[in-house]
Amino acid sequence: MTRAVHYRDRNAFLQDQVPGSFWISGPEEKGEQSFIFFCPCGCGDKSVLKIGNGFKPKHGPSWCWNGSTAAAELAPSVNWQGHWHGWLQAGVWRSC
C-alpha cells in the first residue's frame, strides 16, 4: 500500500517525485481533467489519466474520480500495462 499524496503546486510535485503522489489539472470545457501521478511502486515513472469529477469521460481510456484530494478514489482500477495494476481507494494505492 502506498499513500496517495495530493500536490496543489505542479512544480513541487514534479520536483519531489513522491511515489503515488498526484496532481490534478483544472477542468476542461467538458469537465475532463488530467490526473498526473508517479507510479506507486517507487520506480519514478510518471503517467497521465483522463478523469471526470463524479463521471467517467466517454472518449478513450478514462476514470471516474470521487472529487476528493484527501481520500482520492478512481474507478476502474489503474492498469499500467506490463508494470503495475491496482486501485486507488480512500487515498491509498493498493496493488492487485
Could you say what each language-model-derived stretch is?
Residues 2-38, 46-96:
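A short Gly-Trp-Pro
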Residues 42:
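Polyanion-binding surface elements
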